[in-house]
Amino acid sequence: MGSARANVWRVAEKNVDLVRPQIEARPFALDAQPQALRVDAARSAFIVVDMQNDFCAKGGFLDYRGVDITPDRKPIEPIAAIVPKVRAASVPIVWLNWGVRPDLLNASPSLLHAHAPEGTGAGLGQRIPGGAPILVEGSWGAQIVDELVPDPSDIRVTKYRYSGFWDTELDSILRNLGCTTLFFAGVNADQCVMTTLQDAMFLGYDCVMVEDCVGTTSPDYCMLATLYNVKLLFGFVTQSPAIERGLNEAKLGG
């Protein structure tokens, strides 16, 4: 009885076995900073944050605001390359995207102000002139960019704060899956990726940022500070080719 193989009971008419099944470790070596790692693929998940139209596509929210979205599009190619390889190793893929309610009842004034600081122009939940409502769940802007195609087996989680752990089911899902190590990809590295990674670390997860699979439209020093702080305080930094190499050497995946 249970929704995930790592967290089930065995139930009969007169007794219940609460002993969870042992999940066989599937370790692989991973080049990372500040130290090399040994990671258990059986207890890992790969989280892709906010690779959605409002941040990464022409006609989306950032493009409407005049932001150069080139840095947010840069991770698309490496994410598209590594996700199938990670999936083939039976590592869960989690697509974590912004999506506020259309009535904005899950958005506070402080959150609304951050997206329209002068109170003018389109902000959260409002419609871009000639376009879709901004970051509304189910809207075009909340959809994953066309270049990244989730598999039906992948997991989707909607968030409405910068951190994907705040008031969402993400932590429950990961604990049901038995995950202890989380890989992070997506945008913006210094904002939603970083706050999600920080909350994960505070909750006791092992955190690995995949450097070539994250991007930000912030100034370069913001990315440098993000990588510095991840390595100093919150976890580790690796590259997607290192993940692929480690999985291949351990003969994990297809």
In which residue ranges do the predicted regions lie?
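Short, well-ordered beta-to-alpha junction loops that form the rim of enzyme active sites
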Residues: L96-G99, V187
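A short alpha/beta connector and helix-capping loop motif
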Residues: A42, G59-V86, V91-N97
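Active-site-adjacent betaalpha module
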Residues: M1-A45, D54, D72, A81-A89, ...
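Active-site loop/turn elements of alpha/beta-hydrolase fold enzymes
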Residues: M51, W98, D212
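Short acidic, Gly/Ser-rich segments with clustered Asp/Glu that frequently serve as metal-coordination loops
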Residues: Q52-K58
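Short beta-strand "acidic-cap" motif of Rossmann-like dinucleotide-binding folds
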Residues: V48, W95, M209
